[in-house]
Amino acid sequence: MSNRAVPQGYLANLQFRIRSDNLPLLSTVQPSRGHKRGGRAVNYAEFDNELLEDFSNFPTFDIDSDSNDEEQSSASAGNDDPQANANGGEAAGVNGQGSGDGGSANTGAGRHGKSQLTAEMEKNYKTGVPDLNEQKDSLNVLRYQKIRESFQHGKIAVPYRLYVPPELSTGQQEAILIPITLNVEHGNNTISDAFVWNVNDTSISVEDFVTTYCNDLGLYGNVSLHSQIVSSINEQIQELENVASLVIPDLEVVVNLTCTIQGKFFEDYFQWNLSDKSLSPEKFALIIVADLGLAREFAPGIAHSLHEYLLHVKKEWAEGSLHQDTVPNEAAFGYLAGVRLNIDDLGAKWAPKVEYLTQEEIQKREIEKERNMRRLKRESDRMGGGARRGRRRLDDLELTMKM
């Protein structure tokens, strides 16, 4: 047995982990069973029991079109090599679940024409993977099932060479961060992701980022999905770029922050100064995660939710419809108050909390939060729209007098 080991960062199991239930970044939607026009109807009453038993031994394929069935049957009938048949079955299906659209980690070139992965890329990804039994395992870590599965489902990591010119790296402007939310459905796959995009970072374009993003998810060369994600990111950037670049004077708002990850519902209630640049949402999220002992997945989730809330406050402030709850300042001579003592509940409202909730309870909390925000917006419109209503009534009165 050889003592060679896999180099550091040679294999990646990202595509395997994102399809698990704990990381629902790329989920597979089960297609609904329905009659398709043009589908071939099979009358099983014509077969005897023995024929049905023989028929059940053959592998099943998609019956989206007659040509695909004939091509699959002719390929399997003309090739008696079991290894070749196994490779053909892998290229035709996605983990034994039928043909996919390039959204699986084991998707081959595909005889259905749905995957755009070339034969050369497929060969490079299938060759060069070290054997599991030839690894030097001095710590005996391969005996654990999770580690063995991670090694077996690993694929060769593709290094991305990103050249940043010196003038771009040294002359960067102040970061304008925009929270991006992706909820894209393509075929049988649904991408649900959230990240932050810096508008002033010109070292990489949206198109190049989406290309790398699709390659990491195993969606190689999917042109329609690539354009769909690019358009979604560009729309959100155009919508929020002007709001994110606003410079707001000294303004303190009360933030009711919520974040849900892996069935854990995080909620916090605190005061935030929009003009203070010493504390960013990313630093705040890291402090919260460290203090509460949360998983690392909460750090980008909390930062993204805080960015969304602050942009919502900026937009209302620019439109003149900001209605925020303020903390009464009980200090004398207009100075800022220090630590407030609440004898009733000891400030439990201002403490972060984490709850284990079901999916129905999480959706109920989110609906209640959106309902409260709409109620506050209606109240602010009612308070700020009195002059407009009075003018409209005066115009109606003048029109009535003229008539």
From Swiss-Prot:
Molecular function terms from GO: nucleosome binding
Chain spans, region Disordered: 58-115
Biased composition (Acidic residues): 63-72
Gene Ontology CC: one annotated term: RSC-type complex
Key word Hydrolase present: no
InterPro entries tied to this protein: Sfh1/SNF5, SNF5
Compartment(s) of residence: Nucleus
Signal peptide per UniProt: none
Compositionally biased tracts (Gly residues): 95-105
Gene Ontology terms: biological process: chromatin remodeling at centromere; chromosome segregation; double-strand break repair; G2/M transition of mitotic cell cycle; nucleosome disassembly; regulation of nuclear cell cycle DNA replication; transcription elongation by RNA polymerase II
Keyword Cell cycle: yes
Sequence ranges of Low complexity compositional bias: 84-94
UniProt function note: Part of the chromatin structure-remodeling complex (RSC) which is involved in transcription regulation and nucleosome positioning. RSC is responsible for the transfer of a histone octamer from a nucleosome core particle to naked DNA. The reaction requires ATP and involves an activated RSC-nucleosome intermediate. Remodeling reaction also involves DNA translocation, DNA twist and conformational change.
Family of the protein in this entry: Belongs to the SNF5 family.
Record protein name field: Chromatin structure-remodeling complex subunit SFH1
Organism in which the protein naturally occurs: Candida glabrata (strain ATCC 2001 / BCRC 20586 / JCM 3761 / NBRC 0622 / NRRL Y-65 / CBS 138)
Gene behind the chain: SFH1
